Amino acid sequence: REICLPVGLKEIGDWAFAYCSNLKKVVLPKKDILLGRGIFKECEALTDIPHLGETGIRAEQVGKLLGAVPTKLEADYLFSPKEAGERVWLSRFDDRLREFLETPDEDGYTKMVYCGEEDIVANMDLYLAERRRAKSRLCFLRIMNDTELSEDFREKLKEYLVSHTKGCASQAAWEVAFKEHGNEQDYYEAFAKVGCLTEDNYDAILSEMGESYPEMKAYLMRY
């Protein structure tokens, strides 16, 4: 679930941690490292790649952002332990996230079908729903780890989440918060703070929560 690599590390070979489905955290030294192919392929649980020996809120947030690069952001060129957290790197991260949000949801579907992945993508509707959840996950991630986040881009992230909240044609933002992070208050706090909890969907949200996560339900009722 967690690996800490030493400061003397020089290289990570091809497929080093590929298919480690339970791997959640990898601590890396902030230095140039020769990186092989597919290091974290199919490591779906991986969410945190902090720098060795660094502490504090900024360091924690950078670890979360770097952790998203190999598994969620589809941008191998951003996986640079040495550059991660620098202002230029954060700007490039946001540029890639902006590009991802602006990419039509249907992009990539035909390619996956041609590659024989019909069993994974049963139909277009399921594919589109997952793409919107993927975008919502990254919007939440960046808003909750907002080091060097510009106000203009913050508004764009908020707009995406609000347009995919409970009651919208796509409820991806609510699905991510409730179904994937049901007992994590940070997500409910972000969900409510950006404007996803409204007078129009308040009752429907509490109704869907039912008896699940009573503390989180109480939090929303107090908000």
Describe every region a protein language model picked out:
Residues 1-11, 21-34, 44-149, 157-182, ...:
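Structural signature of tandem-repeat unit edges
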Residues 182-183, 212:
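Ankyrin-repeat interhelical turn detector
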Residues 190, 195, 207-223:
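Charge-dense, extended regions
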Residues 14, 205-207:
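N-terminal cationic amphipathic segment used for targeting or macromolecule association
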